[in-house]
Design a protein with these regions (language model features):
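N-terminal cationic and glycine-rich segments that engage phosphates or anionic surfaces
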Residues: 1-101, 106-441
């Protein structure tokens, strides 16, 4: 991987793309530390260790701690992710959107435009929720007497804070699009990657704090560290795994030349959806707790328990729903990315066939069965990686007084490793286009 980046750096065009991507990430990190008018940034964050394992920890992880400190990019890219999920689900249910999504490049641009506008609407709604949240945490500036603003100044304060967070959401979306157009990697993934990496020192510091407590932690922390490193190797292995469907092309005579006749294969990856199922599953599970910022409900009531206890990352209910959502989104995006009918039709048009399988419907059925099996295997492996830290946290709680929160560890590692591998592959393809040998050669 490092050799790939070194070789890419030697190419002027790729070096410019890498520098541009680094510049965008730097701007994002500056925005993540930039204060908002009327908001008093807490030196130790809005919530502390008592919030460990809750959805607040997840949002803080996804935003690189910006959510915890109430800075400009506190909402980060989460409104855009949620908007993408909703629009793509609606595209399956609404014929007009489904037709638009199949209209090629123009249709894709229109769908992206709809997603952006919807993301702004969600960003505005989440900004209102976040305003009430930081207000409940006494994070808003007060008058000279230490009292909250009233009347006109209270309204002005609310408008400024909400608009700033909405503008922050729009700016993060724009930064992601700039990476897509002029940089390297996927914009959304790179921003999430930057946020998670920025939070790594805090995660490492938390592990050291567990060690200071002594006792069983002297055994549990090293095991957790070794397991997390092992997860990295496992994710790399899973990402490189694929099923090769043999393809045989018939010979064709065009004029005086003969074409085809070669044998090749169609690769079907184990983890064909990458990190998307994990990102989207986590984002969907954060929607209800976000709504709870508006209406926390009665203390001890069903709604309050659902959003504060059951949807906490360390609760078995959360783990079960998380597992189901990962599998659902894995199948959902596999269905979007791969169309067995089109794949079989393309083979027929190019005089290709799968040995032992008749063209037409049998080929479609064969490809569909393989896709379903590979999707299931990939989804289960992805779920195991995502769930392992949650299960380990539960086991650690049996042997220690304070427990051990590693709930977001699996999600973080999957996103980081997945984004790094996707970026490496994109660099490899760029170098291959320029006839430059890279790591995979």
């Amino acid at each position: 991987m490092f050799r790939t980046f070194i070789n890419a750096w030697k190419i002027t065009d790729l070096r410019k793309k890498l520098l541009f991507t680094a510049l965008i990430i730097l701007i994002y990190r500056i925005g993540s530390a930039m204060p908002v008018p009327f908001v008093d940034i807490a030196s130790e964050g809005i919530f502390g260790e008592e919030a460990a394992g809750t959805f607040l920890t997840y949002l803080s992880m996804m935003t690189g701690n910006a959510f915890n400190y109430g800075t400009l990019f506190a909402l980060s890219i989460t409104p855009y992710i949620n908007a993408s999920i909703i629009i793509q689900l609606l595209a399956v249910a609404i014929p007009a959107l489904q037709k638009l999504s199949k209209e090629g490049e123009e249709g894709r641009k229109k769908m992206n435009k709809i997603t952006r506008y919807f993301a702004l609407g969600l960003g505005f709604a989440q900004s209102i929720a976040y305003y009430f949240f930081i207000k409940s945490q006494n994070m808003l500036l007060t008058d000279a007497n230490g009292k909250a603003f009233t009347g006109f100044y209270a309204v002005l304060q609310a408008i400024v804070v909400i608009l700033c967070y909405t503008a922050g959401t729009a700016l993060v979306m724009w930064l992601g699009e700039q990476i897509n157009e002029k940089g390297i990697g996927n914009g959304i993934s790179m921003i999430l990657f930057a946020g998670i990496v920025a939070r790594m020192p805090t995660t490492i510091a938390n592990l050291y704090q567990y060690m200071d407590r002594g006792g069983a932690y002297f055994v549990l922390v090293p095991i957790a560290a070794i397991a997390l490193v092992g997860m990295i190797f496992f994710i790399v292995w899973m990402d490189n795994g694929e099923r090769k469907i043999p393809i045989q092309y018939a010979k064709r005579v065009v004029g005086r030349k003969m074409y085809g006749g070669q044998n090749t294969h169609m690769p079907i990856k184990v983890n064909m959806c990458g990190v998307l199922p994990v990102i989207f599953a986590s984002s969907v599970l954060s929607i209800l707790p976000t709504i709870a910022m508006f209406a926390p409900g009665e203390e001890g009531g069903f709604w309050n328990k659902l959003t504060t206890v059951w949807l906490g990352q360390t609760h078995p209910f959360y783990g079960t729903i998380y597992f189901i959502f990962i599998i659902f989104f894995a199948y959902f995006y596999a269905a979007i990315q791969y169309n067995p009918i089109e794949m079989a039709d393309n083979l027929r048009k190019n005089s290709g066939s799968i040995p032992g399988i008749r063209p037409g419907k049998p080929t479609v059925s064969y490809i569909t069965n393989i896709l379903n099996r590979m999707t299931l295997i990939g989804a289960l492996l992805l779920s195991v990686v995502a769930m392992f830290p949650i299960i380990y946290s539960q086991i650690a709680g049996l042997f220690t007084e304070y427990g051990m929160n590693l709930a977001v560890g699996g999600t973080s590692i999957i996103i980081m490793v997945g984004v790094a591998l996707e970026t490496e592959k994109q660099l490899e393809s760029q170098m291959m286009m320029r006839h430059y040998k890279g790591f995979l050669d």
